[in-house]
Amino acid sequence: MTGLFSVQIDERCQKRLKQGYPWVFRSEVLNAKKAESLAPGSVVDFVRAKGDFVARGFYNPKPQLVGRVLTLTEKQPIEKFFIFHQIESALRFREKLFAEPFYRLIHAEGDGLPGLVIDRYGDVVVCQVNTAGMEALFPHVEAALKAFVEPKAIVLRNDTSAREQEGLTQEQKVVFGTLENPVVTITENGAQFQADVMTGQKTGWFFDQRDNRDWVASLAKDSAMLDVFCHSGGFGIQAAKAGATAVTFVDSSGPALQAAEKNALLNGVEKKCQFIEGKAFETMEKLRDMGQKFGLVSLDPPAFIKSRKDMAAGLKGYQKLAKLAAPLIESSGYLFIASCSHHADLKELTDHVAEGLATSGRSFQLIKTAGAAPDHPVHPFLPETGYLKALTFRFLD
C-alpha cells in the first residue's frame, strides 16, 4: 500500500494509460465524487475498479482534464529524486544537442513533467508552471535547477491562461538570485538576439523555430526576403546574416519591430533591413499592388486556431495567407509557412495552404515539412506536444 488516494478509472481509460496515453478526464473516473475532496495537484494512484494499480500521477478535481500520468511503475515514488532524475536526464540530452546554453530544457509532457516548461537563457532560467501538481513540486524543481544548472537567476513566468483552468493564480517574479537586466542576449545559429524574459512573449524567445530559421536562412541566400509576422526578427535577421540581399520585416506590433531593429543592429545587418508596421493581410496586399517580388516569403503567424470551434475560420486564414503570398514570390522562389495551432493536423494545413497557392495558376512543389527543434520533444501519444508544423513550398516557373 502506498498510502496515496486511489482514483478508480474505467476500462477504456485503463487501456489508454497502459498504451502510453498520459491524460485522464473526469468522465473516465468512477469515484469522481469522492475524489472532489482531493487538494488540486495531489499525487494519486490510478487503479482499476478492483484496486489494481495502473498508473501514478497528478489529480486536480477542478478542470475536466483531472489526471496527468507521471509513471506506470508502482514502485516509483513521486518526490525529490524523481524530479531530479527527469531534469538531469533532460539537461544531458540538451547538452548533446547544443554547444551553447540557450534552449528549452523541459517541454512538459514531452519530458515527462506535465505542465512544466523551462527555457534556459545561459545563466538565467525561466519557468512556467501550468499544473497544480507541478506547482506543489516546484520546490524540488528549483532545487534541481540549482544543483545541475547553477543559474544566477530563476524567473517564474506563471502568466498563462492554462493556470486559470487549474485554479492557479498568475504571477511573474524572480524566485532565486538576482536578475540585473530582464533583457538577456542569446546566440542562435550564429546570430545574436535580445530577449526580455519578464515581459516577452512566452518566456522571451521562441526556441521551437531554431532549426526552421536556419533552414529558411539557407534558402534566402542571394535573394530578397519578406518576413511577415516577424516579431523580433528571428527569421529575417538570420537570413540577412546568411547572405540574403535584403529583408523586409512586417509586424503589427510597434514594440516587436523596435526589438527587430535592435537585433538587426546587434548583428550588423541593419543596412539590409526594412521595417513595416502594419497588419499582415493588408500589408501583403499593398506589396502585391506595388509589384514587389521576393525570392522567399516567410509567414510565422500566431495561432489562428485556438480551439476546435476556430478550425474552419483558422484554416481559411492560412489559405488566404498563401493566396496573398503567391504573387509576391518570384520565379523559382519559396514560401515558408508555420502553424503553432495543434488542432489543425499536417494534412489539413497542407491542403489549405496548397489551395491558396493554387489560385496563382502556377506550378509548385512541397519540398519540406518540419516541426519544432529537438529540444521540444513530442510525447508519442499526445499530439498536442507536437503543435508546431512548418511547410516549405517551391514554385516551379
Whereabouts are the PLM-identified features?
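Conserved class I S-adenosyl-L-methionine
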Residues: D222-H231
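C-terminal catalytic and target-recognition region of SAM-dependent MTase-like enzymes
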Residues: K320, Y334-D397
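Mobile active-site "lid"/loop adjacent to the S-adenosyl-L-methionine
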Residues: F294-L324
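Non-catalytic substrate-recognition/targeting regions of SAM-dependent transferases
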Residues: I106-D119, E135-W205, D214
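Non-catalytic accessory regions of SAM-dependent methyltransferases
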Residues: M1-R120
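Conserved SAM-binding loop of SAM-dependent methyltransferases across substrates and taxa
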Residues: S232-T245
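Conserved SAM-binding motif I beta-strand of class I
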Residues: A246-D251
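S-adenosyl-L-methionine
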Residues: S253-S298
